[in-house]
Swiss-Prot record:
Statement: the UniProt record of this protein carries the keyword Signal: yes
Biological classification of the source: Eukaryota, Fungi, Dikarya, Ascomycota, Pezizomycotina
Entry-linked InterPro entries: Chitin-bd_1 (IPR001002), Chitin-binding_1_CS (IPR018371), Endochitinase-like_sf (IPR036861), LysM12-like (IPR053214), LysM_dom (IPR018392), LysM_dom_sf (IPR036779)
Pfam families: Chitin_bind_1, LysM, LysM14_C
Annotated gene: LysM9
Remaining remarks: In plants, chitin acts as a microbe-associated molecular pattern (MAMP) that is recognized by lysin motif (LysM)-containing plant cell surface-localized pattern recognition receptors (PRRs) that activate a plethora of downstream immune responses.
UniProt note: phenotype after gene disruption: Leads to enhanced fungal virulence, with faster decaying on infected fruits.
Cell location: Secreted
Job description of the protein: Secreted LysM effector that might have a role in sequestration of chitin oligosaccharides (breakdown products of fungal cell walls that are released during invasion and act as triggers of host immunity) to dampen host defense.
Molecular function terms, GO-annotated: chitin binding
GO cellular component: extracellular region
This protein's name: Secreted LysM effector LysM9
Disulfide pattern: none
Signal peptide: 1-25
Organism: Penicillium expansum (Blue mold rot fungus)
Length: 376
């Protein structure tokens, strides 16, 4: 009996030690982490989502989202997030804001590179003098532009004796996101270049003797020989490369499938392409897009009869899809032709857990034109 009680006692100890650990371990979800460049884990806000719902789905809190995005572009708090916004779900540097095809100022102009100093984000692509850049990336002088929600991240330090919108010639003006600061920097750069050229000319003029000239001639001759050899080598290399050239690597296509009914049922369009990285190419759904399948370009087909029949997208009459699926890439959808900015445009991305997205009240009312690409 003594042995029996000892075994039960040992088993009970094992349950107490192992059981809680296994249970708690199973309940812990993987929390998003910053990438290798210390850029935070980026998330694209979907239609109708709130910080609370996003936080719950990623095992963090709403307060965490507020903290992670304190320095994000145009961040006004969880109460005003919009579909298509890039937000942080982990610690780390903020991501560049989503590019807007129509933007002419600010960091959302297509192709804008990330600044080395994040606090200078607001000074990128400035408007002409006396104009303000709105949160939608347009220049103007009305209160709609000059009281925009877009702003320099809160971490930016400013001199307390410098007032907004005042011109200044001190070096401290560089830390203020005002358009006059940019021309001042260009003038300084130009002056320094000019000074450098003058010094170089002076040094050349000061060569005094014939011996120096002769030496220069020999050096020049040697350089020419070296250059010729290099060019010859490069030519051979290129010839060898062209001989062994293979077909370019096929990029996995992005695609946007749009259905006539909810839950991704009914007739549908399939729009797909292979372009990698953002470009300003606009795709009008009924703009003569090719229906020919390709490994490099864009194609668009209209499927009917349960997918058994297909033709060009121009033949389809659907402009207000009730559901859709985005795969691989990002598609910004506009309710007007030529991807012209309007208040109803939205960016759509894949949703792995629920690929089919049904229409909601915040979605783009009409799918007329698109700007799509894959991030690679």
């Amino acid at each position: 009996m003594g042995h029996f009680h000892l075994s039960n006692f040992i088993a009970l100890i094992g349950i107490l030690l192992v059981g809680p650990t296994a249970t708690s371990g199973a309940a812990v979800s993987v929390v998003s982490q910053a990438d290798s460049n210390d850029i935070c884990s980026k998330y694209v806000v979907q239609a109708g989502e709130t910080c609370s719902a996003i936080a719950q789905a990623h095992s963090i809190t709403t307060a965490d989202i507020e903290t992670y995005n304190a320095q994000s572009w145009a961040w006004t708090g969880c109460g005003q997030i919009s579909q298509g916004d890039f937000i942080c779900l982990s610690s780390g540097e903020s991501p560049m804001p989503v590019a807007l095809p129509h933007a002419v100022c600010g960091p959302q102009v297509p192709g804008t590179a990330r600044p080395n100093t994040w606090s200078k984000l607001g000074s990128l692509n400035p408007c002409p003098a006396n104009q303000c850049c709105s949160s939608s990336g347009l220049c103007g002088t009305t209160p709609d532009f000059c009281t925009s929600a877009a702003h320099v991240p809160v971490a930016l330090s400013m001199s307390t004796d410098t007032q907004p919108n005042q011109l200044t010639t001190t070096s401290q003006a560089i830390t203020i996101s005002t358009s006059p600061a940019i021309p001042l920097q260009k003038v300084v750069t130009s002056s320094e270049t000019s000074s450098s050229m003058t010094t170089s000319t002076s040094a050349t003029t000061s060569v005094p003797t014939t011996t120096s000239t002769t030496t220069t001639t020999k050096t020049t001759s040697t350089l020419k020989t070296t250059t010729t050899s290099t060019i010859s080598s490069q030519t051979k290399t290129k010839t060898s490369t062209s001989t062994s050239t293979t077909k370019p690597k096929i990029v996995k296509p992005w695609s946007l499938t749009m259905y006539t009914k909810q839950d991704c049922k009914g007739d549908y369009y399939v729009l797909q392409g292979h372009n990698k990285g953002y470009s300003d190419t606009c795709l009008n759904l009924h703009g003569g897009l090719s229906s020919k399948d390709t490994d490099t370009g864009v194609s668009c087909k209209w499927f009917t009869n349960d997918g058994k029949s297909s033709t060009k997208c121009d033949s389809g009459a659907l402009t207000r899809p009730q559901s859709w699926i985005v795969e691989t890439g990002i598609c910004t959808v506009f309710s007007v032709k030529d991807c012209k900015h309007d208040l109803h445009s939205n960016a759509y991305t894949p949703v792995p857990k629920h690929p089919c997205q049904n229409r909601g009240k915040f979605d783009t009312p009409y799918f007329v034109s698109m700007n799509c690409y894959t991030e690679g």
